[in-house]
Amino acid sequence: MCPGNWLWASMTFMARFSRGSSRSPVRTRGSLEEMPSVHHPFLNVFELERLLYTGKTACNHADEVWPGLYLGDQDMANNRRELRRLGITHVLNASHNRWRGTPEAYEGLGIRYLGVEAHDSPAFDMSIHFQTAADFIHRALSQPGGKILVHCAVGVSRSATLVLAYLMLYHHFTLVEAIKKVKDHRGITPNRGFLRQLLALDRRLRQGLEA
């Protein structure tokens, strides 16, 4: 379980015991390989939730989900000693606001900072930040020795959504492939609104490849 994530615990409980049927879209049985591919004609938010609640659900304050790319929480972002130990050169904060996250917080560490003022709400349009965030991550990982922490409050929804978008935009992963890749290392739960936006990105990218 992600540190301090009471919401994760309650949602996992509901996923396991609600509806009382093996047809529940968020059941926890089965392996990732049994999940539908992105080309499945009925792939939707509910199928993605099945995938998200299958397999690895644990996470630490930060987990390396791609070489040099750490997905984590606010506690890790505030831990200067650990950031220095990991060799973090860039921080992308997906929960930036006037009280949480400033470039000045990393003075003396040589860390470059990007803040995204996003709300963990299904109604929030995270897609407007997909390209900017992906570009920032790409620049961080392109420099010699570059390592980036992408975080929000808990590190499972807002920041995870931006990491998934990065893998899709820069590494041509399908959404399902991106989710599987991240879940090999960290449990994530983007909210339904973010999943819909990622599905829209996935369809747009696939249409571009097929054109």
From Swiss-Prot:
Its main location: cytoplasm. One of its GO terms (cellular component) is nucleus. GO terms for biological process: negative regulation of ERK1 and ERK2 cascade; negative regulation of transcription by RNA polymerase II; positive regulation of cell adhesion. Residues 60-207 form the Tyrosine-protein phosphatase domain. It is found in: Cytoplasm; Nucleus; Golgi apparatus. It holds the Pfam family DSPc. One of its GO terms (molecular function) is protein serine/threonine phosphatase activity. It catalyses: O-phospho-L-tyrosyl-[protein] + H2O = L-tyrosyl-[protein] + phosphate; O-phospho-L-seryl-[protein] + H2O = L-seryl-[protein] + phosphate; O-phospho-L-threonyl-[protein] + H2O = L-threonyl-[protein] + phosphate. It comes from the Eukaryota. InterPro entries: Atypical_DUSP_subfamA, Dual-sp_phosphatase_cat-dom, Prot-tyrosine_phosphatase-like, Tyr_Pase_AS, Tyr_Pase_dom, TYR_PHOSPHATASE_DUAL_dom. Its EC number is 3.1.3.16, 3.1.3.48. Brain and skeletal muscle. In the brain it is expressed ubiquitously except in the hippocampus. PROSITE patterns: TYR_PHOSPHATASE_1, TYR_PHOSPHATASE_2, TYR_PHOSPHATASE_DUAL. The active site is at residue 152. SMART domains: DSPc. SUPFAM superfamilies: (Phosphotyrosine protein) phosphatases II. Keywords: Cytoplasm, Golgi apparatus, Hydrolase, Nucleus, Protein phosphatase. It is an enzyme of class 3 (hydrolase). Belongs to the protein-tyrosine phosphatase family. Non-receptor class dual specificity subfamily. Inactivates MAPK1 and MAPK3 which leads to dephosphorylation of heat shock factor protein 4 and a reduction in its DNA-binding activity. PANTHER family: AGAP008228-PA, DUAL SPECIFICITY PROTEIN PHOSPHATASE 26. Interacts with HSF4. This is Dual specificity protein phosphatase 26. The gene is Dusp26.
